[in-house]
Amino acid sequence: MASVSLGIWSAVGSRCERAGETGISHFLEHMLFKGTPLRSAARISQEVEGLGGYINACTSEESTCYHARAHAGHAAKLMDVLADMYLNPVFDRQEITRERRVIKEEIAMTLDQPSQHVLELSDESLWPGQPLGRSIAGDERTLNRTRRRELAGFHARHYVSGS
């Protein structure tokens, strides 16, 4: 059985964040799964997982990747879903509030894992005051300040041709 893996990489990660935007790349990654004008958050998952597929994303210092995998015969559907998510997020305010809580839980889990926490402290020591020295997930202060306007603005600046 042949499978296909597709991905959209954007050359934007935590390193591209301005002061006061810590974690916005990661927050945006979460929000792209939360609906478009054509698809609800549930429909995004259902359209891929209903094919026996898998869809996910990851954010690093240098890039953000949205990827999906399914039977090779579903390549066009995977690309349609990924492209719609990438280009047309709606940034629903209720979903933003929910995802803010999810990300805070992720941050707390990282702090509870000594090996992960040590890596973040090392980056902070190696790159003080620099984007590379800040947590990819952000911190509670910046998460609480991040609103729809900031997410949409970051998307408009970085999720365009050439980024």
Can you name each region flagged by the protein language model?
Residues 41-163:
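Charge-rich, well-structured scaffold segments of protease-associated domains
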Residues 1-43, 67-70, 80-82, 152-163:
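His/Glu-rich zincin catalytic helix
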